[in-house]
Amino acid sequence: MELLRTITYQPAAGTKMCEQALGKACGGDSKKKRPQQPSEDGQPQAQVTPAAPHHHHHHSHSGPEISRIIVDPTTGKRYCRGKVLGKGGFAKCYEMTDLTNNKVYAAKIIPHSRVAKPHQREKIDKEIELHRLLHHKHVVQFYHYFEDKENIYILLEYCSRRSMAHILKARKVLTEPEVRYYLRQIVSGLKYLHEQEILHRDLKLGNFFINEAMELKVGDFGLAARLEPLEHRRRTICGTPNYLSPEVLNKQGHGCESDIWALGCVMYTMLLGRPPFETTNLKETYRCIREARYTMPSSLLAPAKHLIASMLSKNPEDRPSLDDIIRHDFFLQGFTPDRLSSSCCHTVPDFHLSSPAKNFFKKAAAALFGGKKDKARYNDTHNKVSKEDEDIYKLRHDLKKVSITQQPSKHRADEEPQPPPTTVARSGTSAVENKQQIGDAIRMIVRGTLGSCSSSSECLEDSTMGSVADTVARVLRGCLENMPEADCIPKEQLSTSFQWVTKWVDYSNKYGFGYQLSDHTVGVLFNNGAHMSLLPDKKTVHYYAELGQCSVFPATDAPEQFISQVTVLKYFSHYMEENLMDGGDLPSVTDIRRPRLYLLQWLKSDKALMMLFNDGTFQVNFYHDHTKIIICNQSEEYLLTYINEDRISTTFRLTTLLMSGCSLELKNRMEYALNMLLQRCN
């Protein structure tokens, strides 16, 4: 049953049903009703089914107990089955751990006995076929599937904070800022699906999953289908009753507009704690849906009312597009948090919570925006966000990574536009040809260099900085030119620690580029070419006017000429600590004996960020999938670390790659990284 419903005698209104089941519900004997069983808190029990497939009726899952240790017959990989996460019509979803690397998945396990009929197996195959091709930040990631004699196993992204249905069950209603936060992510994922010409057809709270970082992922593709032209659309009725659109009920087919209708139902439910068309029986619910008849409480503000009303327009053509939704006043005129605390899963957030960080940002906002004392208030359903808060939000928002101008080309909704294919210059290529190739490959956006003059377009660096870059480029190029072809990464992996950039902020439109190292040192390379670091003790500042010239002073007693820069350094430190996640799983090690790292040069293209440090550490972060390459020198030996899109790291000796080769995905990134390094002063 779907979650949010007052205790009524409505028969299982949240259950996914096919046309046959819906027909019986509409035309059957309405006297045969069974009361829903409330949970301990007085709310109806939710049947949350992570990635549950389409089903006709509820089935029990009695049968042979699934083994604790499961082996993929094809690869020989061993998995450990954990706790049950949810149940569907054909399947149960379990926590499942890959015993080779301890990666945790959500595994949908479907007994062959449940899909013995051809049309049942066809549904599972169709779901796998659609889902395995999808890759988006706000869509549950499909990883792998296999089968043995007893079951089919589908390995999906594990979302530790369960679903929006669980959150709403605990919270009853959400605040407007939270609804904006979640809806933005739903719209992002749904826009990607529609661009792939895929209809979800079962958007509801139980199919929005939340990961550890409070990021939302659209899941459950059991009812998903390819978008067909209007005249070729199938007329079957499928979905969850409370979220069905008028055109689907009227057997006119399911289009993108039908997903928009369901999104309107979702927004209404988040804000008010119940679906808009809920009634005491299914027949009346369908009558209300066909007439688009529902109540709009006065507690909602005008922008929220207007957006809901537009999405729940009876005529599909009158509903807004996903782009229209994001441009609506509900989003433009209201406060949206950059991130949510995990406490929001069970507690109303206090966006006015007083804290040292909040007070710090208050002062920062006052300094940057003139210290206005405007007391005008912005009212929403649950919060009053003052002008002061809007200024703080503006500061936080302004500190976000500068967005890259989108190019008019087709690409994934969460990706930056792709540059042309990279070309690594081989031996024998002339310097002129080399520069031309790299110029074609890398589309530069912005850069910063230690000791440079911000008013000059030339790259001003001394010979030492040039030699650091040349050494890294020579080593990386030598590896790429001589390593053999391979289709996987080497098995030999190292366990070592080194410093790398875990967080970064590009605020070069005002101040400069900020970053945090894995030992919690925070650095800023200012636009005027000076570099300043706040050490992990948060008490000591290192200042470099140029390479090798270091001044050291206390953060609380900075020389007068450095006070403004120390203030900005602290802004960056607070912002990254409060708002940004670490970019990988490498250990954080603080070793005071190690030489201090400071940034020599950073460079952004339309695809990646490059950072070069004084000791030759070289890091490239790729925007679209959050993968990273780090090259460093330890004990006169070069190491390369690759952090994949799941933030899992592997470290190799470059000599190992030179002998064994590597996967194409890693090689392509190494080539692009080399091109960025060679391009850095062009």
Swiss-Prot record:
Q: What is its EC number?
A: 2.7.11.21
Provide the binding site for ATP. Answer: 85-93, 108
- Consequence of changing residue 236 to D/V: Does not significantly affect kinase activity
Q: Where is the composition biased (Polar residues)?
A: 36-48
Location relative to the cell? Cytoplasm, Cytoskeleton, Microtubule organizing center, Centrosome, Centriole; Cell projection, Dendrite
Please give the residue ranges the record annotates as the region Disordered. Answer: 25-67, 403-432
User: Is ATP-binding one of the keywords UniProt gives this record?
Assistant: yes
| GO cellular component labels | centriole; centrosome; chromatin; cytoplasm; dendrite; nucleoplasm
Q: In which tissues is it expressed?
A: Brain, lung and heart.
Which family is annotated? Belongs to the protein kinase superfamily. Ser/Thr protein kinase family. CDC5/Polo subfamily.
Task: State the protein's name.
Answer: Serine/threonine-protein kinase PLK2
Q: Which gene encodes it?
A: Plk2
